[in-house]
Amino acid sequence: MPLLESTLHIRHLGRQDYESVWHAMQHYTDNRDENSQDEIWVVEHTPVFTQGQAGKSEHILNPGDIPVIQVDRGGQVTYHGPGQLVIYPLLDIKRLKVGVRQLVTHIEQSIVNMLKRYDVEAYAKADAPGVYVEERKVASLGLRIRKGCSFHGLALNVDMDMSPFQRINPCGYAGMEMIQCKQLGGPQTVEEAGKQLVETLSQELGLANLVHHQGLPESL
């Protein structure tokens, strides 16, 4: 495998508002060509509800002072906020020879594998994307594929204020109970979770050569 195809660039973005990162990953994806590098963006967002393309307004119960943004990913409404790890895999899945369903499985399995390091038994569900522990949801997924390339990604609850989830039906499921790593004895900080999950995700994708960066690409 050529070096370009086997190298994964990891960008650590820190805490950012949702909209600017969303527009940056749209721009990155729209301007990709066959030589563009694959990247994973690791970020923590300020509080926001995002409504996916399948989203129905009745699932947003009482947003209050938290903004609601309609976005171009799959899925329904979810919440992002401090203490939650968000990872955006910006991958040329055509070049990697990975199908969309296969990519979802790789992402879910990487979370399961990461939590297994902490003796937490997690699992995916065929009918409801995400990762669960004892029927409570610890991670949400929502992807978009454009020109054979992925953007958007996953959100893992680590150590956060969970109360905003009560203002919505998470992922369109009324009464869906959410849980976080801190309660489970998993990683206790976003930084720790990010380090572990980048490892298991790159292993799942078969990409061993990792190059770390701080901040967005200079071209954005």
Swiss-Prot record:
It holds the Pfam family LplA-B_cat. It catalyses: octanoyl-[ACP] + L-lysyl-[protein] = N(6)-octanoyl-L-lysyl-[protein] + holo-[ACP] + H(+). The active site is at 171 (acyl-thioester intermediate). GO terms for cellular component: cytoplasm. Substrate binds at residues 73-80, 140-142, 153-155. GO terms for biological process: protein modification process. Residues 34-209 form the BPL/LPL catalytic domain. Its EC number is 2.3.1.181. The record marks 137 as: Lowers pKa of active site Cys. The keyword Acyltransferase applies. Its main location: cytoplasm. Pathway: Protein modification; protein lipoylation via endogenous pathway; protein N(6)-(lipoyl)lysine from octanoyl-[acyl-carrier-protein]: step 1/2. Keywords: Acyltransferase, Cytoplasm, Transferase. It is found in: Cytoplasm. GO terms for molecular function: lipoyl(octanoyl) transferase activity. It comes from the Bacteria. Catalyzes the transfer of endogenously produced octanoic acid from octanoyl-acyl-carrier-protein onto the lipoyl domains of lipoate-dependent enzymes. Lipoyl-ACP can also act as a substrate although octanoyl-ACP is likely to be the physiological substrate. Belongs to the LipB family. In the reaction, the free carboxyl group of octanoic acid is attached via an amide linkage to the epsilon-amino group of a specific lysine residue of lipoyl domains of lipoate-dependent enzymes. This is Octanoyltransferase.
